[in-house]
Regions:
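PAPS-dependent sulfotransferase catalytic domain
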Residues: 1-172
């Protein structure tokens, strides 16, 4: 048997951009049975949340997954609004994140599900998502207080250009 302590992941950085505020995790009071669903954007997060919801709620149809399993690090609504709503939940919590593990507070008692998807496939879904997003999404991300960094604009029409920019900025 090993005498070495487990080296749990540690948060070593914060991520603030037009979508994310990783500091929301700093103030979360974890419960022992919390489930954290982590993926890069457009990699099956909502699908995984729906599967977990079906397991936790015995197949109950029409669950409001976005409400009962919030994206904790999304800037909108701000963490001052979101954290009390999460704390008030009485069901087993399952929370969404798009943060890399080094920007996420890790709780050894929580359960983690990570989904990966080939980046060459992801970039097509992201481009499609933003190319077809309505003005309300862009207004919420760009005009809500707390924006860090540049405003987000619509993607270029040329998917190859978008892919190269996505690679250049390491997907963020």
């Amino acid at each position: 048997m090993s005498t070495h302590a487990i080296a749990w992941p540690r948060k070593t950085r914060e991520i603030h951009n037009n979508h994310m505020d990783s500091t929301a995790w700093n103030d979360l009071v974890f419960r022992d049975d919390d489930i954290v669903i982590g993926t890069y954007a457009k990699s099956g997060t909502t699908w995984t949340q729906q599967i977990v919801a079906q397991l936790l709620f015995n197949g109950k149809p029409d669950l409001p997954v976005a409400e009962i399993s919030p994206w904790l690090d999304l800037r909108v609504p701000p963490k001052a609004v979101k954290l009390p709503m999460v704390e008030a939940q009485t069901h087993r919590r399952f929370l969404k994140t798009h943060l890399p593990v080094d920007a996420l507070v890790y709780a050894p008692t929580a359960k983690y599900i990570y989904i990966g998807r080939d980046g060459r496939d992801v970039v097509w879904s992201i481009w499609n998502h933003f190319a077809n997003a309505n003005d309300l999404l862009y207004q919420a991300l760009n005009d809500t207080p707390g924006l860090v960094g540049p405003r987000i604009g619509r993607p270029p029409a040329d998917i190859r250009q978008y892919f190269l920019e996505w690679l250049q900025f390491d997907g963020y």
